[in-house]
Amino acid sequence: MTALSESEVLNDKEFPSSRQLKWILAFLCLYFGLRLLFFALFISPYIPPDEVTHLGLAKIFSKVLLLPENSVETYQYGLVTNISWLYYWVMGKLLPLNVFGISDLLFLRLFNVLFAFGTVFFSWRLLRLLTDDRLTQLLLVVVMTNTLMFSFLSGSVSYDNLVNLLAVMAIYYLFAFFKERSVGFLAISFLCQLAGCLAKLSFLPLALILVALWVLREVKGVRLLPVAVKRYCRATGWRTYLLSFAILAGLSLNIQLYGGNYLQYGSLRPSMYEVLSPDIALEHRISARDMIVEYFKDGRLSYQQAIQRTRFISHQGDRADTVYLIQRLADHRVNGYEMLGPVAYIVPWGEHIAATVFGIKGHLSMLNKGLTIVPVAVLMLLALLGSVMSWRRGTQAGIAAHLALLCGAYAIFLMYAHNYKLYLYYENFSMALQGRYVFPVMGAFYVCFSYYLMCLFRRESLRLGLAISAAFVFISLDFPFFLYHATRNWFGLLPPFF
């Protein structure tokens, strides 16, 4: 065992020391776990986004070895074919392991908690590629484990939890490849990207951005890649063949799913009424809403016919939402409606994303708006200032800059290719506009945020004060904010007895 250098001894006297870091991280993880357990135990299944549907699909997938077929039993949950199926397949294969006498809902919620811890862990590992600064590590774990919508979602059954984990893993292993030059890391990143695309369609743009980033960074050294691959294959043996098989299988499954959908239906994700029939689509609340609104906009249904069709939507809230959309579109036809332009859309989009990241948006909402969101905005501006100062000092880290570029590219794609497009179609600003859709890059964003915020000052006392202030803001806007605003409508029977 080698003796510590004088600089290492002095550095370990700063707060937090190595020992203090371990204890504080353990406490933060324990606090995070207890909160997720609270959400898993006490939140009604009718509150988290589409949890009843996710649970129903998992049960359907549990009854077959591979993939199920559409049937009368499945219609109420939408399509079970032609969809991104990986999450439901994994959850379905876990359900037979529930021999503990608890409900399937609670059992799957607890497994989703593990996905959340994995997301936090790989976000921390991503930061370690950038810096070993212990105060920055603490800040990252605080903000990751105290973002309300992420905490709330992590205690529910949702494919977003698996997608978030695969996303941060794909990002981590790609950037680990950039730093360590290990072909194995690159292969794992590609595998995570392929798995993520099978878990949710919205992973596709992230995968494309990651591949584009890899190509742009490695274009000069592309000639050396075959040599590196051969060297890696000789060194790893059977692991190479296993990874290669997994990547080829993932690629084939993606081509079969998305390529098949596009060739047969002209869309990567066809509608239920395109795959089955309009009458069957009325049995699924979201498919019914989309079909009725589309037919009304196209003139295939009159206003009265569209309103009458909504009676087939059994869920009262979804039926009311569909009626509202039809009435709004009809009113705009008569009175006109001034739509926001692409530039004017940016600020309200950002405000709503923040309100539903640091608040909750599900079948009940708890938006964080007004004065309570101001401290977060101030911290974000300070982190931005820290990035500018880091650049001016010449200490701008390449990894941080590329992570910021990645987050920006994904946000722009989400804003315009998804949210703005739906806004123009439905003429409704909040349609499918939810903060959880940015969670695939949340880990990367918080790595940049923590790193640049701690770059703002060099003096340790100022850095510590800023970190404590940021931690107080995030912690207070998570569980305390929820408890202050939650009503009895948020809570249901304990899942073991549900």
PLM feature segments, named:
Residues 1-37, 218-222, 227-249, 388-404, ...:
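Start-transfer (signal-anchor) and selected internal transmembrane alpha helices
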Residues 20-51, 59-65, 246-262, 409-413, ...:
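Transmembrane signal-anchor helices characteristic of membrane glycosylation enzymes that use polyprenol
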Residues 35-40, 52-82, 86, 94, ...:
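Extracytosolic helix-loop segments that constitute the early lumenal/periplasmic catalytic or substrate-binding loops
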Residues 81, 85, 89, 98-118:
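Loop-to-helix entry region of an early transmembrane alpha helix in multi-pass inner-membrane enzymes
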Residues 102-106, 123-146, 165, 463:
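Transmembrane-helix signature of polytopic, membrane-embedded enzymes
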Residues 107-131, 169, 382-385:
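Transmembrane-helix motifs of polytopic, lipid-linked glycan transferases
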Residues 128-131, 170-185, 196, 218:
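Membrane-interface transmembrane helices that cradle and orient dolichyl/undecaprenyl
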Residues 216-217, 237-382:
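Membrane-lumen/periplasm interface segments of specific transmembrane helices
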